[in-house]
UniProtKB/Swiss-Prot annotation:
It comes from Chlorobium phaeobacteroides (strain DSM 266 / SMG 266 / 2430). HAMAP family: Ribosomal_uS14_1 (MF_00537). Part of the 30S ribosomal subunit. Contacts proteins S3 and S10. This is Small ribosomal subunit protein uS14. It comes from the Bacteria. NCBIfam families: PRK08881.1.
Length: 89
C-alpha cells in the first residue's frame, strides 16, 4: 500500500487541476504563456498520477476499473468484476 502522504499529495493535485482548469484553458487559447507559467505547478494535469482506488499503487493501474493489476486479478478471479472472465483459447 502506498504511503498516505503520497495519496494525499495526489488528491491535492487533483483538486488544483479542477480549480484551475478553466483559467488554464483560457490562457492557452489566448496564448498568454507568461500568465500560464505563474499558475501553480501542481495545477497541470500531467502531474496527477492514476492510482489504484484500493491500495494506492501508482503503477500498472487499469483506468477503466481504477484498480492495479494485483487487485484486478484478485477481483476478476472472484467474479466481482462484471463482464470480466479469464481468457482461454
Amino acid at each position: 500500500m502506498a504511503k498516505k502522504s503520497i495519496i494525499a499529495r495526489n488528491e491535492k493535485r487533483k483538486r488544483l487541476v479542477e480549480k484551475y482548469a478553466a483559467k488554464r484553458e483560457e490562457l492557452i487559447k489566448a496564448g498568454d504563456y507568461e500568465a500560464l507559467r505563474k499558475l501553480p505547478r501542481d495545477s497541470a494535469a500531467t502531474r496527477v498520477r492514476s492510482r489504484c482506488t484500493l491500495t494506492g499503487r501508482g503503477r500498472s493501474v487499469y483506468a477503466k476499473f481504477g484498480l492495479c493489476r494485483h487487485m484486478f486479478r484478485k477481483f476478476a478471479l472472484e467474479g466481482k468484476l462484471p463482464g470480466v472472465k479469464k481468457a482461454s483459447w
